[in-house]
Structures are given as structure tokens and as C-alpha cells.
Amino acid sequence: MKQNIKRNWIWILIVMIVIGIILYFSIRNLFSTKVAEWSISELLNNIERAKENTTDALYFKEITVNPFTNSITGVFNNTDNTSTSFVTYTNLDLLRLSGVASDQGVISKIFTPEVFLTANNVSGSLKSVATPQPNPFLGILISSVPVLILIFVMVWIYRSQVKMMNGQGGAFGGDKGTAQIIKSDKKFTDIAGNKEPIEEISEVVDYLKNPGKYQQSGARMPHGILLGGPPGTGKTLLAKATAGEANVPFYFVSASSFVELFVGMGAKRVRQVISEARKNSPAIIFIDELDAIGRTRGSGIGGGHDEREQTLNQLLVEMDGMKENSGLLFIAATNRTDVLDPALIRPGRFDRIITVGLPDVKEREEILKLHAKGKRFESNVDFANIAKRTPGFSGAQLENVINEAVLLSIREDTKVINLYQIDEAIDRVMSGPAKKSRTITKEELTMVAYHEAGHAVVGIKVPGGNKVQKITIIPRGNAGGYNLMMPENEKYNYSKADLYATIASFMGGRAAEEIIYGDNKISTGAADDIKKATSIARRMVTQFGMSDLGPIEYQSDEGSPFLGKALASNSSLSNQVNHEIELEIRKIIFTAKEQATKIIKQNIELLELIKESLLKKETIVGEEIEYIAKHMKLPPEKIEEKDLSKNSEDNNLDSLIEKTSKKE
């Protein structure tokens, strides 16, 4: 492809140079001085008239006698202070005159009829030779050159477009195909977590290596495997590991590369990729971001006649049509399995749909240890505790945490990575870097401290609420403060009480502001808390059936995948039902907020202590919060960082404080 592009640019450069030369000479001839064609008699007569009116004998500005073409050219000084360019052709021998033509002092003696006749031994009068006429065919040819060049360029561009549409490259890029044969050094052993997806794919890879073992039992290989799940969970990494494990050609293609400018290109490229893979079967075709072409048909603005749907139709035919795909395995990855066309995910096309979900606490520990290989950490770094502090993190985020910690270690010039750097790396991944240089007034800082302390108090006192593991009043991202709230244990199912407790934890910040400053002085700092609390309450009413409206789903998930939920929502709910839903959401939020307000009023002293600790240290962790709640006093300042960061499951902070006090 690069050679084609280079060759195209060379031709473009040549054409531009030729056109430039033609334009240069055309403009030069257009603006050049008009040349008078004089016969010898006219030339001599002009010289005689100049003799009568001129005394300095400077008749010419310039003059050239060319004996090879028998021509005289020059610029003649007229008597009216003007000049005339002339040319004279003759059959006389001008060789003797060429040597003295530049000496204007003798021109008056040379350019006389007698001299011309004597010098050439010609008797009689002087005769002029007709001016040479150019070849008419040559003139037509020269005038046709620009038109021919223009036609050539147009034909060349047209052929380039045709080549590109045929997949052979062209003036606008294009390539022979969109698939790349990948050779990966990744193995399944290089992946931490995702045990179930690895087992499913390993079975298919084994089928490709040992087809006889399965054929004896009458089993057929799955036509396709669809990997779905949130971003960053390792779907593409699984595909790379599959390429490294399988000893068969592995074709990688992005779904978006099928659809381009020209109509029909997508379907053609699908045929090209699959045809090439069939020639080298058994083979694997991996399609990344399948939702780019696999969305439900007939829902878009263009109906069923757009390029994307033609491409999808071709893919459906190639995967399970009249042609057999023996030895050909399709693997695809997407974050949006919910918007895929039903015909694409039926058995016979993508037989297996594997969800690659977010890792649990044990898998997070394995992922952290995998990415920590080759890096130096302090001895007190416990990856199990780090895994507990990062619920909901994907594999990509965990890798980024380790990388950020390494970068912080280099920035601070420490030879090993310590707990503080890992802690800061987690915060950077979640909320961005701290903005320590931002100027904040003391009043605003105090309000932020009360807000964050309110979250902590409610989390401590409400059973099932989110526990605050870390609080800081140092701005991060767009937030004035930051708190890390996590449930005590990771759950997959939540009770109604758990959700109420979670909403109450979110409303703790706003409740603290109202208690301390009053309704008229509340701030915008609770915006994100309100958004999250409202989202949970809405799902409790419309999806989970946890309200007085009963166990009914009031929210349909059949919106258009193209126009979005808002534009394409065809709600079948009446205005009265929507009003009742809003009332139930309001009831849940207000109930949780009243609970948070009541708890904070009952524990106002704890709120003040946590606020004072925040203003004093700017950042406090879960162990310090627990100590304050248990002893109702601020923890000592000189607590060793390695002790403070240990796991608090056994609530051993009291003994650490006692040890620290004894050291003092």
C-alpha cells in the first residue's frame, strides 16, 4: 500500500511540473514584447532615417547577427525616444558581419546596400526572404498539450478510484483487504482472572489443534464466539492470547473498517476477508467492536438501505449461508451485546456468548500481582488489601494503578514503590490528580469538610451502608473534595434495606450541610450524590419492584440503538403512572434523607471530630475514622504509615495506637 501511495505521488508531481512549465511559457509569450518583422530594405531605410536625425550613431539598444539562421534580431532606437524589437531574415551570407555587429560605431558603415552587395558578391537590388512559417500541425499539437494533460489526469484519477473500489489501492488510499494476520506472543497463562472465558476459548483452540478427537464423538466446532462485557475487562487480550495459543492463521479486523465512503465496499470487504481465510483454513477471524456493523437492522434513520446494514447482511450470509465454513472460527468482541441484531447472535453464527465481567476481589489480587511482576515494592505492600480497596475496577484500570504508582515512584525518586504511591495512584485513576495549588477559602474548605464528614457518619451508623474508606478535602478533578465509599462486602444481590442504606449514605453530605448551615446555605457539592441516589431510587421503583407500585417493570429497554433512549423512547405509560413513579422516587429519597439527617443530629460530636481531623490532616483513611468513632477523639498524629495502611478487618488499630503512644 505504501509503495502504491509513493508511486501515485510521483505521478502527481510529474504532472504538476509539466503543467507548470506549460503555464510559464504561455504566460511569458502572452506578456512578451511584440516583435516587428522587417525586410532588409525596411531595416536599411530605418537606419538611413536614423542617420539624418541622430548624431551619436547609436541606432540599436542591442543587435544580434546570426549567420547560421541568416537572421538579424535586435531592438532599434526610434527618433521619438521609443524602441522597436525587430527580426530580419535574408539569403545573404552574414558570417562576415557577425564579428563587428556589436561595434555600433561602424554600424552606419556596415548596414548600407553597397556593403551588403559587395560583401556577398551579389549584383542587383537587395531581396528579402519570407519569414519562416511554423508547421501548422505542430502548432495544433502544442496547443492541444494542456487539454491532453487534463484528460490524462482525469483518466488516471478515475482508474485509481476503480482500483480502490476493487481493493487494489488507489489515489485516495485503500488497501487490498482490511484483515491483518496477527502473530501474538501472548498465552492464556499471561492472563489473570477470567477463568471461565479462558476455559471456553481453550476448548475451541483445542478443537482446531486436534479436530479428530471431537469428530469421533460427532461434535462440531462452534461457528462463532462472542465476547461481551464492560470496557477494559480483557476481551481483546483474550483474542491476542487465542492467537498465541492457536497454531492457525489469526485474522484481526476492526468492524468499523468494513464501512467506508463508497457504497458496497463493506460487503465486498467482508467477502474478501472471509474468502482469504477459507483458503487458509483452519483459521480464526477476530472482529473487534462488532457493534459498529452488528446493530439491529431497520432501526436507523436510513431504514434498511444504508451501507452498514448491507455489510451486516453480507456477514450473516458468509457466517451461516449456503457455503460451508468448515475449519473457520469467528471471534468477536463488543461492549454492547444488547444492541446486536438477533440474527447475528443466534446459534449457527455466534454459538457461544461469553460475558467477560469485572473481576472480583480474588481476581483483582491476581491481576495486580501479574502487573507487579518485574517491579520493586516495599515489603509491607499487601495486594489483597489493595484489591479490597478497588471494587468495580476493571483489569485495565488495575494495570493503570500499578503504572501510575511506578510513575510516582520515578517522580519522587524512590527506589521502591510504597503504599502512599499506590494509594495516590488509586485516587488518580478514580478521580484524577489532586489540585493542591487551587486556592480555596477557609469557609469553603470547612463546608467541604462537613460535607465529607456527613458521608462518614451515616456510613458508620447505618447498617448495610457504604463505609467511607478514605476522605480528602484536597480537590480532585471537578470535585472540591473526594471520598471513597465501599460496601463492607462485595455483593451481587442487594436487599431493599441495603439500597435504602446506600441512598442514605449518599445523602449524608447534603444533610450535614443543612444541619450546620441551614437550608439557605447549602452548596452544589451534593450534585453527584443526588444524581447517584436518584438513579438507585428510580431503578428500585421501575425495575426492582421495591415500592408501593408493586413488582411491575415500568421501564422498557427497547429503545433504538441509533437514536438513543431519549429520542426513540415510545413509552406506553400514561401520564398518571409516570406521575406516580416520580412520587415514589421522591418518597424513597426523602425517607433516606430524613434517616441521614436524624443520624447526623444524634452524632453531631462525631461529625465535628471527623471535620476537625480533615481540616488538620486534609486526608484521613478508614482506620482513622473507625478510631474516632470508637474513642470519640482524634487519633495521634505520629502513626507509622505502614501500620496505618494495614488491613483493618481485625480492628487492630487500637493496639497500634497504644504501641505508638508507648514509643512516644
From Swiss-Prot:
UniProt topological domain (Extracellular) ranges: 31-136
Q: Which EC number(s) are documented for this chain? A: 3.4.24.-
Ranges per topology, Cytoplasmic = 1-9, 158-664
Disulfide links within the chain: none
Transmembrane regions listed in the UniProt entry: 10-30, 137-157
The entry's Zn(2+)-binding residues are H451, H455, D529
Q: How does it sit in the membrane?
A: Multi-pass membrane protein
Question: Where is the stretch described as Disordered?
Answer: 639-664
Cofactor binding notes: Binds 1 zinc ion per subunit.
A Pfam family (short name) is: AAA_lid_3
Q: Does the keyword Transferase apply?
A: no
Major location, coarse class? membrane
Which keywords are on file for this protein?
ATP-binding, Cell membrane, Hydrolase, Membrane, Metal-binding, Metalloprotease, Nucleotide-binding, Protease, Transmembrane, Transmembrane helix, Zinc
Choose any GO biological process term that the UniProt entry carries and state it: proteolysis
Q: Known SMART domains for this protein? A: AAA
GO MF annotation terms: ATP binding; ATP hydrolysis activity; ATP-dependent peptidase activity; metalloendopeptidase activity; zinc ion binding
Q: What is the protein's quaternary organization?
A: Homohexamer.
Record's function text:
Acts as a processive, ATP-dependent zinc metallopeptidase for both cytoplasmic and membrane proteins. Plays a role in the quality control of integral membrane proteins.
Protein family per UniProt:
In the central section; belongs to the AAA ATPase family.
Which protein are we looking at? ATP-dependent zinc metalloprotease FtsH
The source organism is Mycoplasmopsis synoviae (strain 53) (Mycoplasma synoviae)
Its lineage reads: Bacteria, Bacillati, Mycoplasmatota, Mycoplasmoidales, Metamycoplasmataceae
